[in-house]
Design a protein with these regions (language model features):
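Glycine/tyrosine- and acidic-biased, solvent-exposed loop/turn segments at the edges of beta-strands
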Residues: 1-115
């Protein structure tokens, strides 16, 4: 396990290693101690849902990874915890529509991405 601290003594990063390969969830912390992000590693590659939080603890976003590339849904929220935007990735490229939402949850804008 590798750990890094802020100058105030608060844990900044916690990263598990197995046989010199990142294995498990790497966790980043804000200086106040709240979780900033978690990144799942398997076999040294990002694999699974990477999650982010605002300093107030509200969810900021989620991105799905397969073999170190974005693959699947990505969702982002405002600091108040309201969904702001969603999109999908395939092989690290945006796949389909980018959808922006109003604070009441209704669609505000849809951007069709043609590749």
């Amino acid at each position: 396990m590798e750990r890094t601290w802020y100058p105030n003594g608060q844990l900044a990063v916690e990263a598990p290693w197995v046989d010199d390969v990142q294995e498990g969830s790497v966790t980043f912390y804000y200086e106040n101690g709240s979780v900033q992000a978690t990144i799942p590693f398997y076999g040294g590659k990002i694999e699974g849902v990477q999650k982010y939080w605002y300093e107030n603890g509200a969810p900021q976003g989620e991105e799905t990874y397969r073999a170190n590339m974005k693959n699947g849904p990505s969702i982002f929220h405002t600091p108040a915890g309201i969904m702001e935007m969603s999109l999908n990735y395939r092989d690290d490229k945006i796949d389909g529509s980018q959808i922006w939402y109003y604070p009441n949850g209704q669609k505000a804008r849809v951007v069709e991405l043609l590749i």
